[in-house]
Amino acid sequence: MTHEAVDTTPLHGTGWSFRSAMYDPKYRSIFYQILTIVILVGFVWWVAHNTAVNLARSNTASGFGFLRGRAGFEIGQSLITFSSDSTYARALLVGILNTLLVAVTGIFTATIIGFLIGIGRLSRNWLIAKLCTVYVEVFRNIPPLLVIFFWYLGVLSVLPQPRESVGLPFSMYLNNRGLAFPKPIFDTGMIAVGIALVIAIVASIIIARWAHKRQAATGQPFHTVWTAIALIVGLPLLVFVVSGFPLTFDVPVAGKFNLTGGSVVGPEFMSLFLALSFYTASFIAEIVRGGIRGVPKGQSEAAGALGLHPSSVTRLVVVPQALRIIIPPLTSQYLNLTKNSSLAIAIGFSDLVAVGGTILNQSGQAIEIVCIWGIVYLSLSILTSLFMNWFNAKMALVER
């Protein structure tokens, strides 16, 4: 009885190689990544092709050439010159600048209020702690749009008419058309004042770093705060005087029926600014409170044992350590405030969304306008995140 020899040589076919590769985690991971990219590219191509076909079918022009067209509408509040004869592109720029104005001023104000309320919630004073708690619970549980309507319809709209404006210090007037204040008029000498201010800020930073290294090496403190204040205030003021006071003010004057002169901040911006600031501050207050609670209690007890005043313990020991806990969630609140500024359309403030909506209605370029909205808000979010990540890295605890 004869036995046939069995060929045990491995098969080297394509199917065999593919099956073998799929059992290797490295090649399997590469395959899944390539497959995912192919699917995403195919989906994007399908969306683009389908959009192009539908636009062609409806005889709708595409592209961003419409931005050179005449706007044909006015914008109530603008940081740059704008008229109805300006282009759509300039109108969008006005909207972007107004959005940035709301975001920057709102973030700054909300941070200050949030820190004060957060620290106040931990106060040993029963009344202060309870008032701060009520503030947080009220604003945190109300939709931001309702807060905006409260300030716009419930506070600013019931102010007196312009002829009965409420007089405020520094020649300012408050009425239902907004806040009128003196308009600064700059002369050419203000350029030198600005340069002096930049030099003073840079010098203050250099001195602060030198003082930090000096204290780490010798233990001797240096009054950097008062030095910085003296530089930042004193040097520009000296240049301002030497330049012949290159700044005047156009002061608003109360007339029989209206105010003349000066500048006016409309009630729409004031409502949006106040609403977003107070609303976001309630969330920041909880972040601050949680960050302070996250600092070991022994740190404050040790500082108190050294004879530091409670306010000094909070300022010098607790808050610097709490910042490492506070900064990451604080970034989310800054992003939320920036995106919530799009609610300005509800009260007629000309932010990016409101201006873009007007342009969309006139031009019909819906896809392009939506793309501009997305790109602008995405860019603002990325820039905010990058800055906060950099700041978080600077505040991180460096181990030796």
Curated annotation (Swiss-Prot):
Q: What is its main location?
A: membrane
Membrane topology of this protein: Multi-pass membrane protein
Supply the name of the protein: General L-amino acid transport system permease protein AapQ
Q: Which family does it belong to?
A: Belongs to the binding-protein-dependent transport system permease family. HisMQ subfamily.
Q: Which gene encodes it?
A: aapQ
Give the transmembrane region(s).
29-49, 100-120, 142-162, 188-208, 225-245, 264-284, 340-360, 367-387
The function of this protein is:
Part of a binding-protein-dependent transport system for L-amino acids, affects the uptake as well as efflux of these amino acids. Probably responsible for the translocation of the substrate across the membrane.
Mention one GO molecular function.
Answer: transmembrane transporter activity
Where does the signal sequence lie? none
Q: Where in or outside the cell?
A: Cell inner membrane
